[in-house]
Amino acid sequence: MAKAPAVGIDLGTTYSCVGVFQHGKVEIIANDQGNRTTPSYVAFTDTERLIGDAAKNKTASNPYRSLDAKRLIGRNFSDTNVKADMKHWPFTVIEEGGRPKIKIEFKGESKTFYAEEISSMVLLKMKETAEAYLGKESVTDAVVTVPAYFNDSQRQATKECGVISGMNILRIINEPTAAAIAYGLDKKGGAERNVLIFDLVGGTFDVSVLTIEEGIFEVKSTSRDTHLGGEDFDNRMVTHSSPEFKRKHKKDITPNKRAVRRLRTACERAKRTLSSSTQAKIEIDSLFEGIDYYTSVTRARFEELNSDLFRGTLEPVENALRDAKLDKEKIHEIVLVGGSTRIPKIQKLQDFFHGKELNKSINPDEAVAIVQ
């Protein structure tokens, strides 16, 4: 059987995807559910381990054992970001040898996992997705993208994820570089070009300024907000909806993690709808103590709830420009990456750049899963 080609994997905080170079272009591969992106979740039930869509579907009924671990990769337990994130996770994180480990109950036993072990399970899912599509015996070689801000420890930890999953990581590529390649910006000839990558995903927000000259990339600056992303927009809707439920029914759902997870899932679905419609319904049967929750939210209300967060996206943009020692007029290309850039208010970013056209024709969830 012929050797499988190398694949490109975007191992994301909330979603991952895999692509392969075939027929003269990169093809993004759909998973066994028919989805081109796969939730970066692993869940442990009383009887089995689930990865991807099946795992995310368990977050409402199984919040303590549904894990998303990329924020922990390559970090120490004492890291201030780890401490901050632990307050929001329903699962338990403990210290072992100075490193964070996730503790869960599985098949009646207490188990602990490093973040790299959890992420390797997601990588394995991507590997299996590619193998099912290609019909090859084994996909072993991969190029994996990482955020530009990842330090050496985090990059090495990402390679370890590959080793654990049985893959050979050919190269680690910066996500903004991958996005620029996806748009063919490295193929545009002529003088040096300045590119701003606006990467707003589920859990984080990154801005990078690159220069490209004769196919050579240089990252001039990066700026980020580790707690600004789609999940934060979801949380605002949850924070708005919980008191509404309490006013209507005199019941407080906030101590009930399962109810809050179900509400968050419904809010995320409504948020996605509001990118293409001006109104969305939130409908949850038996949310809490047998009480149904039905409401609707308009795009205008959604924008109002998140107005400070949307405004907050400009600060990292300004910081990245300042660190790169560039005026915004000197930016030749703006590339949108990440599912949250579908939000119409976010696309108003072009107003800041005096109406400059945005590169957004490629599915923003898939823009960095490239093979070079």
From Swiss-Prot:
Regions that span the bilayer: none
Keywords for the protein's UniProt record, in alphabetical order: ATP-binding, Nucleotide-binding, Stress response
Cited SUPFAM superfamilies: Actin-like ATPase domain
A GO molecular-function descriptor: ATP binding
Position of the signal peptide: none
A Pfam family reported for this protein in Swiss-Prot or TrEMBL: HSP70
Statement: the UniProt record of this protein carries the keyword ATP-binding: yes
InterPro entries in alphabetical order: ATPase_NBD (IPR043129), Heat_shock_70_CS (IPR018181), Hsp_70_fam (IPR013126)
Superkingdom, taxonomy of origin: Eukaryota
Family: Belongs to the heat shock protein 70 family.
Protein name: Heat shock 70 kDa protein II
